[in-house]
Design a protein with these regions (language model features):
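Non-catalytic accessory regions flanking glycosidase/transglycosidase catalytic cores in CAZymes
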Residues: 1-234, 270-303, 307-494
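Histidine-centered catalytic micro-motifs
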Residues: 237
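Active-site His/acidic residue clusters
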Residues: 240-261, 307
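Beta-strand-rich domain onsets/edges
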Residues: 265-266
Length: 494
């Protein structure tokens, strides 16, 4: 039996709600069909936004939504997406499927979506093919509440008042699709562009994100972090869980135990990535002025047969749920540096939380993990430690069988989320909570065979259910977690 220790007296950091953020790019059917169907659609909508999707995302507790990319961001010119629909310029989405982008979803539509969701805005600016002036004028258009050419243009297009822009990223993947730059060059470009990302509203600082590394590119982090503290508020990190390699990633649904173990073990490398990049940031920014922003993460498998390869459509199983659960626990544990994270992507793309097909909608296992974990948002991370006698391994790496995190809310309620990522082994734990006499304990579980999924023929196969494999103790609990499971424990003291 493994020992699980929780110490509510050890208050570490606030778990930012934005760790549970999402990302929607102009890619495949994420925006179009997935979220935006237009006002004239027969699918129920409010101002073009699918009512079912908006409701589901609100129920899940979506705190922030990144847009318009991704690689798309560095070929997106915002003025093409404003004004009358009939006058908007069409373009070819060269990164994603070579389809025509009609720009019917632009800045105004994005902020209407943000309004309906009740979440914060995270806009990604164009450094790769844009200009300083273009970026400056976009920020002015979105946020200035005075008399100026851009503010007047916004009013002409129907928005009398500016919007609140919480986050703004200066470029995306500038080491790759955003310009193939090196770290030193990008850092100088960031400083130049960032100068003109102005705070137009008193008391409303726009949080600036600098382009950070791709996965294990520690040199990039060092180069950029030598130049951006005092200028940037955050540094991005991108890491995708690819079971094999980019030419042969593996199927999203047809996989064996070896494939499963490789996936969850490689997902756990996020712990190493966050730790090592944070070490560099701590050395160059000991005041912690710059946060870590993991604004692209998740599983990336081969696309579903018969779909456009550029649309990145993949189904979602309990394996994906395990990746989501263990990763969110890692982010929670590093809440002192990780301010925001954005899973890729919200609807119909990669590790989506929602799938749509016509007027039908499916909530994926990943969706249910996010909804389970939403109680952690804005809680205080507390000290916790779980022993692990077993590991899940692949040739390159390994992961502990269980990954956990614990938090406490302002009322003293403790939330502990524990993931058993083994597909074959159950796990017994005995939890002791320091200086706590347990009054009530409730728990819920998401579990199933590693292949279990929700699809349009069986949308409710994977569901969160009450967990009866737990027994309350005076100072904690004893529980037995089945294979491939995530459990949330909610503890109140006397």
């Amino acid at each position: 039996m493994e020992k699980y220790l929780i110490n509510p007296n050890q208050r570490i950091a606030t778990i930012s709600k934005d760790i549970y953020g999402h990302f929607s790019e102009h890619l495949g059917r994420c925006i179009y069909d997935g979220i935006f169907v237009g006002k004239d659609s027969k699918i129920p909508n409010v101002n073009g936004m699918r009512t079912d999707v908006v409701t589901a995302l609100k129920d899940m507790g979506i705190p922030v939504l990144r847009w318009p990319g991704g690689c798309f961001a560095d070929e997106y010119h915002w003025t093409d997406g404003i004004g009358e629909l009939k006058d908007r310029k069409k373009m070819i989405n060269t990164h994603w499927g070579g389809v025509v982008e009609d720009n019917s979803f632009g800045t105004h539509e994005y902020f209407e979506l943000i309004r309906q969701l009740g979440c914060d805005a995270y806009v990604n600016g164009n450094v790769g093919s844009g200009s300083v002036r273009e970026m400056n004028e976009w920020v002015e258009y979105m946020t200035f509440d005075g008399v100026s050419p851009m503010a007047d243009l916004r009013k002409k297009n129907g928005a009398d008042k500016p919007w609140k822009l919480r986050y703004f990223s200066v470029g995306n993947e500038s080491w790759g699709c955003g310009g193939h730059m090196n770290g030193d060059y990008y850092a100088d470009e960031f400083r130049r562009y960032n100068t003109y990302v102005r705070d137009y509203t008193a008391g409303e600082h726009i949080y600036r994100v600098a382009c950070g590394p791709n996965a294990f590119d520690f040199k990039w982090t060092e180069q950029v972090m030598r130049k951006v503290p005092g200028q940037a508020d955050g540094l991005s990190l991108h890491y995708y869980t690819v079971p094999y390699n980019w030419d042969h990633k593996g199927s999203a649904t047809e996989f064996n135990l070896k494939d499963y173990d490789r996936t969850v073990a490689k997902a756990y490398r996020m712990e190493e990535l966050v730790r090592r990049h944070t070490e560099i940031m701590n050395a160059l920014d000991p005041q912690k002025r710059v946060d870590l922003i993991v604004d692209e993460w998740g599983t990336w498998f081969d696309v579903e047969p018969g779909t456009n390869p550029g649309f990145l459509y993949q189904l979602n199983t309990m394996r994906d749920a395990m990746v989501a659960a263990l990763t969110l626990n890692i982010f929670n544990k590093h809440a002192d540096r990780v301010q925001m994270a954005n899973i890729a992507q919200t609807v119909n793309v990669l590790q989506a939380v929602i799938l749509t097909e016509g007027d039908k909608m499916v909530l994926t296992p990943t969706y249910h993990v996010f909804k389970m974990y939403k109680d952690h948002q804005q809680n205080t991370l507390i000290g916790s430690y779980l022993t692990n006698s077993n590991t899940v391994e692949c040739e390159e790496c390994s992961a502990p069988q269980m990954i956990e995190s614990a938090s406490v809310d302002e009322n003293g309620t403790i939330y502990a989320t524990v993931t058993n990522i083994s597909a074959t082994k159950k796990a017994k734990i005995k939890c002791q909570i320091a200086d706590t006499k347990v009054s009530t304990l409730r728990a819920e579980i998401l579990t199933g065979d590693m292949h279990d999924k929700n699809d349009f023929s069986n949308p409710d196969a994977v569901q969160v259910r009450p967990f009866d494999g737990v027994r309350k103790l005076s100072d904690g609990f004893v529980a037995e977690l089945p294979p491939c499971s995530v459990v949330k424990f909610v503890i109140n003291e006397k």
